[in-house]
Amino acid sequence: MKKPLPLILDTDIGSDIDDSWALAMILKSPELDLRLVTTTAYNIPYQTKVAAKLLEAAGRTDVKLAPGRGGEPALDSVAEWVGDYDLTSYPNLLDNAADAIIDTVMNSDEKITILCIGCFKNLADAYEKCPEISKNSRLAVIGGNIYNGACNGWHPALSGEWNIRCDLDAWRRGIEKTDWEVELLPLDVSGGVLLDTPYFEKVRKAGENDPLIRELVASNDVWFRTENWNYYGPTSPLFDTVGVYACITHENLNFQMLPIYANDESVSLIDPERGKMMNVALTWDDKERFYKFLTARLCGEI
């Protein structure tokens, strides 16, 4: 077996529920060596509690956890599930996400992958403070919408994807204008990804004997009620799990090197003059194969 991939997760967990699914998927994946989780974008104390509670449920309080910069309106969709969790009880809580990213990367003997599944404030802050981190790390990024190929009509073509649109300046400072090697997972592959009811029910059943999956499902059910989602159907879109999958394997995904530039409307364009070269996932070979993998991985079958 290959040595596990050293990983940092930079996440806006606690808003859409897919970040929680992505964190659970990481924690269930022996191919990944999670060393740090950083929170970004919204209500940072609440979001950091969400991450801490899931890490604790998995028995992984060895993973360092660092709050980043917020500023946008709070999206506390699973606050009922978080309850009165005491963040000060988390044993590896650090002070600052940007500093934690820098320290983790610069003190590593191996190149680290930073999986970015939220806005890019922490990356921008870390890179501006220490550009040298790009030499010992690479980025895997959920963001953009290139051809709108997998969105099934629910996301308009030539429109800005949220992780870029929520802070275009952070995207430019943290991604486009950096020396980082970038692997991009746009909506073309991460959009329209959801587990149909039989798969979801299998994950729900696994939670009866697995503390992490039990807490994931419990938080998901709170999110459903808060967001008035169809409670007894499939999952909501699980965009960020595609980023985790790409960190594990490139099998089943088709990539192409493209110069990507986000214009002032946050639309991702293929632009040879202004774009940054990125390895972009554009299509699936078999999306059903991914669904089977995700379900089996969360259920502890593989």
Language model: regions and residue ranges:
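N-terminal acidic, glycine/proline-rich low-complexity segments
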Residues: M1-I302
